[in-house]
């Protein structure tokens, strides 16, 4: 089984019996955050793959206009890959499977938070930003999914305005603890779906990076890890870059505490796993362990999108 992540932090993982091997493409091509395009889709790390007749499971964050499918087609044609699966709605499930597999838990509630994953059918500006799963050694069950179009309704306009960022930060801090007139909810297959125009922690940190210019690759990629570190030097008031980072850090901490409390209503297990790009936030991760004294926490050691190739391989062998 071969998992291939075609998102940012591109990676491959192949599983044979109980042995897993994982490779980050940036270690091979020396290009940080590299992700494939239709014009530039070749992986140097593919030289590690021994058998292209294996089953390939592709993962991605959800590009627009069928770009994921087009990239996968190019890769499969070049390497004559005949057996493959790509399900655009599995991004957060792969995060959860990867994290659970390397934890010591037999049961857990996995919370995935990032800047956007699968797109909602027929409403493609809404991307999956928060998810809660119950997971054990036999099954993974979706309990809650939040889809946000904040990237389109808010993000692309006037993000250099620091006052706008401060207002958005206050909204995120209270986001899950009050009813929003602009939210919509529905239940499908025992999972509660939320459609919102609001930001989550991943989107807010991306907005912060654009506001204070923590960007790489000609502005194409945000550097939220640097913003999280910068927050340690700031105040929870003021307009300096480090002050804004501190305010975002505190707002997203409150948001995540609310989400953890929500997760604990779905099952009696006391085991919580955090994954998705926002789980790179080491400072806030520690704070959750102090807030929830009787909860066992496990933080995905590879919570960014690179880990989804690992999760895809695990999902295929254990949960399909």
Residue ranges of predicted features:
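Short acidic/glycine-rich loops and adjacent helix/strand connectors
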Residues: 1-320
């Amino acid at each position: 089984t071969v998992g291939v992540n075609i998102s940012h932090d591109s990676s491959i993982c192949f599983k044979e019996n109980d042995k897993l091997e994982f490779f980050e493409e940036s270690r091979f091509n020396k290009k940080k955050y590299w992700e494939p395009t239709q014009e530039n889709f070749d992986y140097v790390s593919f030289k590690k793959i021994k058998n292209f007749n294996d089953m390939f499971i592709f993962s991605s964050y959800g590009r627009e206009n069928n770009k994921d499918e087009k990239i996968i087609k190019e890769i499969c044609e070049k390497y004559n890959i005949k057996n493959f699966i790509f399900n655009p709605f599995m991004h957060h499930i792969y995060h959860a499977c990867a994290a659970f597999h390397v934890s010591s838990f037999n049961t857990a509630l996995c919370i995935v938070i990032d800047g956007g994953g699968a797109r909602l059918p027929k409403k493609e500006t809404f991307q999956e930003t928060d998810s809660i799963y119950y997971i054990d050694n036999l099954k993974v069950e979706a309990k809650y999914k939040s889809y946000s179009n904040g990237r389109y309704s808010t993000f692309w306009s006037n993000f250099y305005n620091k006052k706008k960022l401060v207002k958005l930060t206050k909204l995120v801090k209270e986001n899950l603890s009050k009813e929003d007139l602009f939210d919509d909810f529905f239940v499908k297959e025992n999972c509660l779906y939320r459609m919102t125009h609001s930001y989550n922690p991943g989107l807010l940190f991306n907005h912060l990076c654009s506001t204070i210019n923590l960007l790489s690759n000609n502005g194409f990629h945000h550097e939220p890890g640097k913003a999280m570190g910068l927050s340690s030097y700031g105040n929870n008031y003021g307009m300096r870059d480090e002050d804004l980072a501190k305010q975002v850090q505190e707002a997203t901490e409150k948001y995540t505490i609310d989400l953890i409390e929500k997760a604990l209503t779905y099952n009696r297990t006391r085991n919580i796993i955090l994954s998705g790009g926002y789980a790179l936030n080491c400072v806030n991760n520690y704070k959750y362990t102090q807030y929830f004294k009787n909860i066992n926490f496990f933080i995905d050691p590879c919570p960014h999108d690179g880990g989804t190739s690992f999760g895809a391989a695990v999902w295929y062998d254990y949960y399909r």
